[in-house]
Amino acid sequence: MALSEDTIKAVEATAGLIAAQGIEFTRAFYERMLTKNEELKDIFNLAHQRTLRQPKALLDSLVAYALSIRRINELYELKGKDLPWTGHLAELQGFFSVAERVANKHTSVGIQPAQYQIVGAHLLATIEDRVTKDKAVLAAWGKAYEFLADLLIKREEEIYAETEGPEGGWRQTRTFRVEEKTRVNEVICRFRLVPAKGGASVVQHKPGQYLAIFVRNPELFQHQQIRQYSIMSAPNSAYYEIAVHKDGAGTVSRYLHDHVDTGDLLEVAPPYGDFFLRYLEAGEQTAADTQASSEFQMLQGRAVNFAAEKTAPIVLISGGIGQTPLLSMLRFLAQKEGRETARPIFWIHAAHDSRVRAFKEEVDAIREAALPSLRVVTFLSEVRATDREGEDYDFAGRINLDRIPELARLEAGHANPHYFFVGPTGFMTAVEEQLRARSVPDDRIHFEMFGPFKASH
């Protein structure tokens, strides 16, 4: 249902007032909602409330939606009248990309339509408390929120159906058993998860996606905790593998390291996430392509299909534990293309030091067995006396793509490499700035940033 001009003007006029309050507005919203609806503490990441990550993310999303609402409404008006609308999609790509990321995150924690009503009521109450008591403006925001909620609810149902429908799929959570737990180093543990029901299959993930792990232990923490961990195994129908970095302040990471062992059971949501390597053979179509509503389907159709671009170079850049989704991509490429690959593939990893660098042996094994042309480059922020240049590391210091001449030669030769990168916020900012400085086109830059700040690209 289209929004009226009065509604759009009222929302546009007050967007700046909300933005001016900064995270104080969204912090007040969360405090109100989580006080009056304590059951939602089982869903929201309370650590992100304390660090203000979630309030910051909500503020950015809310203001961006308000400022784009006119163009979004125009698109849906045209769709409703069966008039050409796809021309509007390019300028709204940022909005729909963020909406897709939010929808995936919501499905991973099991958000249901009724919960949108709770959120909407507290959002309007916060606007009334802190921005305006004007009934017309509040009514306008109510309609605008309902418009957005309907869009997300529809998309989330499509995503639920996509992961539930195929063989091995499910909705909400399913019980898995820890088949193997391996301590990789002093801060990283690796878990292989299989269905608790022996012999059951799992839906194949897209390389780059994550699992949500649901943890409840009243002796250690009051509320259920949900965290997303990238899948590091290649897509298969038998198991998932994740790696967990033990964060000193991390409730769930410490719990998984210290209290979960081989044979223990965990509740797990299906694979989700909008950051993945798209690889469709000729004539192949995924459930996502057929079930997505047209505007999201259009965005997916614009994603690069690496099965069709057989010679497109791929550069995988990771910081710390950020290598896990890229490991899934690398393993997938090794399976799909292997020694016959016609594309240059780079594995560039940055770690603090050699003691916490993980999965070196696995990357070396992939290169030896399947991808002999794989170029592996390692940056260590701190080099120890026992580290050997050329074996334990290639460059000392923080990541600097200018120190890798092969990349410059690829770019100069118009090979147009695709860059996938994942890591902590500071690392991600540095890599993105370096790629922009090298004039890498937007459609060649693909990233996922830890935490709720930025959408995958």
UniProtKB/Swiss-Prot annotation:
The keyword Cell membrane does not apply. Keywords: Detoxification, FAD, Flavoprotein, Heme, Iron, Metal-binding, NAD, NADP, Oxidoreductase, Oxygen transport, Transport. Pfam families: FAD_binding_6 (PF00970), Globin (PF00042), NAD_binding_1 (PF00175). Its cofactor is heme b; FAD. Binds 1 heme b group. Gene3D superfamilies: Globins, Nucleotide-binding domain of ferredoxin-NADP reductase (FNR) module, Translation factors. The keyword Oxidoreductase applies. Consists of two distinct domains; an N-terminal heme-containing oxygen-binding domain and a C-terminal reductase domain with binding sites for FAD and NAD(P)H. This is Flavohemoprotein-2. The lineage of its organism: Eukaryota, Metamonada, Diplomonadida, Hexamitidae, Giardiinae.
